[in-house]
Amino acid sequence: MLYSTSDKSLVHCSVPQQIFYRAEECMGDEIVGSLLCKENILLCTPRKYIFPHLVLRALNMDETMGFQKRENPSKRAEILVVTNRLEMLAFLETCRVNAERLFQICSNIHQYIGYCNMGDTYFARVYWRHILYHYYEGKLPQDVPLHYIYPVASGYRKFNALSRGNRNILGRKDSQNPTIYVTENLDMLNEQEHSFDYIFVDCSYIKKGLSNLPKSTLLFFDNLLDDRIPYLQKSAVKNYIVDGDCIQNIDENEIQQPMINIEELLHKVSIHSLDVEYVKSSFEQEIERLIHLLDKLRKGKFSRYDTNVAAKLVYILIRLPIGAGLYDLIASMQPYWDTVLGLLQELKDSESRYENDSFEEMVSLFEDILYKHSLDRSNPKGDELKAFILNEVKQGKSVCVVSNSRKNQLALKEFISLAMGMTIEELAEYDLQFFVSKDIWAQDITVHCDSLVMYSAINFRDLQSLLKISYKRAKLYLYSSEINLITQKLKTILEAENYALRHFVQNSTQQDSTNFYRYLYNRFNKFARQKVIGLNSAAADLLEKSTTVSPAVYRGEKDYKGTDAVKATLVHFTDGSVSFFTKNSAVYVLDNKNKRVTHKHFHEIGLKDTILFVDNDARKDLYRIFIQSVDAKDTSKQAYLSIKKWRELYEEKFMEKRMDDDRLFRLMRTAGWNKTTKSVLRNWRTGYSYGPRDREDIMVLGEVLGINTFVEDVQTYYNAMSKIRVERRKASRILNKLIYSSKQVLGNEDSAILARYNLTLEQLNESLVTKSIKEIVSDRMYYIKPAEVGLLYNVDAKE
């Protein structure tokens, strides 16, 4: 076993452990051996509790032999662990060091390095028998807490070590650096001032991109369809990928042991009954030419704003499940959503349009796709989706449709409801469910259906629902460009050796024919084998690059000419950055006199003011940072998700009734609503506010729009909104202390709040930036998109 309570290795856990298979034990030994040899490891397995145990195993092996490989063998190993800080610290608190084994290791190290001055605290690692004898007053225990011997430190950029023994007596006897550093900051991998001997990154928790891996780094994944896995094949990593093929070959005698659910494990690493359908479109060549031109323009340093608009348009057209006309009707009802025609018009209105033949050709290709090939009126994917869904519903089957975005989900709901001649609300009566893929994972939703339907995939993330949803049959509708891209990603992984297989699977034929990625590859690659489509790795790379959209690119001095344009004022800050604000934009402003952050409208602020941005967005509420960091099962997260559900129901009915804020305001007033500001209706719908403050407002809105649950479950929604407002006030209190406390020290209550949200002050600091106003441009008004209000731009990012 790996560190069970009966294990007499150096470090073990003092609480009952999950049972590890023999194959996992052997694999773990090989992985740690590779780390000692300065190799990088990619480990993917659904058994998440292996990750912290590998940290212990690396420490154990380093103390027995690894120290001999270091330039300074007297130095103790330093291990960086990038993961959920609180969970890892809780695990380490249960770990113990076997005293008998420790003393043996001290003797071995002492013998290897030679003379050590007993009075020099740097050499405490070889004198633990003496130190512990005095600490425990001659009554040496069998086991000692891990951090007494191997100091543990946690932090984000600055690390604080745990106290070692009563009043840190043991810590004062040992002057070497901590052994285990626990953080959630991935940037520590590239920390120049500190060199770690081993690095463990929990990629199941840390979702950022990975690059420039130091030697002896282990990357842990629990999802076979993580997009970083094919990307990392470009680096020198050894793959240990545990899929269903591995788990099915575990010794039957081991499976009978307690605490093991083999079926649950297999579900996490297996895909079955998948049909990939090639959707032939008449505009495939235009898409291929578009991504080539876009790449050419970007390499030629063409307008960054215009190429970003073009990338958005390519992305939307490939993802669309319906005609662009109906999509635009839905998107135009939300103030922050781009429409297809709106983006196209931006390109046509560009000041750079006639300066570059490639750009002009690109505009013509977009027009051809919409009008010559009729994507404005119909969609080849939508036609096949509709036929399949209606047929399944006719047979009485339950259907789950997964979309990549809320926009496409809403558009497809409207499309299918019109085809079935019913309201969106009534679709659920036919066991027809619609989900956004990221919600299934982020909210830990459990879904069962007969038929799972998806209609776009330009990355592995789009396929992840296949591992989460319990289905009998899955259909995936894709264009040739999408099939080519996914096939190339799968091919990249299959070309690399999987070192985990030899520990689980002895039959070499079986190793190649039934693994997870091979199963998927065969279903995607069949179209190339049948010569229906051609595979092209260069085209796959271009598609991936071309559909990468930057979140905020400065438009410069040019006005936006769309019908949804808003008038805004340009603000220059002292560091050269800029932002746009409307007259009534609500912003956070630093009140230095009273040492607090206040909420003001833009027309109330002046040149001496300092504006607060959260993640480079003046409109973003700080509480969003808190709620993003907490587990889906937390009561605050549940309340937040309840508000999200309420908002989506409101959004859907607003769209279905082709409503606008003026009309809804009149209907609300007629129904007895006593509010006089119609802007709150939009704020509720867009998520700018956390819903109504009055219980009656929820009921009136439900009665006017015909949403029964707003009336029946009003107390549930009201309680959720009230709870989040209380939590938001707590976040604001912490914000004030964070900005105005020079020592940035919180009291016990505020520290407990941060701990519950799994945050540190350093993490909050990374999300916050304050900007001092240098100039408010008063001689000109700018016309911009509603979504551009309040965003922070670097001027040099304009072109």
Swiss-Prot record:
The lineage of its organism: Bacteria, Bacillati, Bacillota, Bacilli, Bacillales. Coiled coil: none annotated. It comes from Bacillus paralicheniformis (strain ATCC 9945a / NCIMB 11709 / CD-2). InterPro entries: DrmE (IPR049794), DrmE_C (IPR056666). Keywords: Antiviral defense, Cytoplasm, Restriction system. Disruption phenotype: When this gene is missing the DISARM system does not confer Nf, phi3T or SPO1 resistance in B.subtilis. It comes from the Bacteria. This is DISARM protein DrmE. One of its GO terms (biological process) is defense response to virus. GO terms for cellular component: cytoplasm.
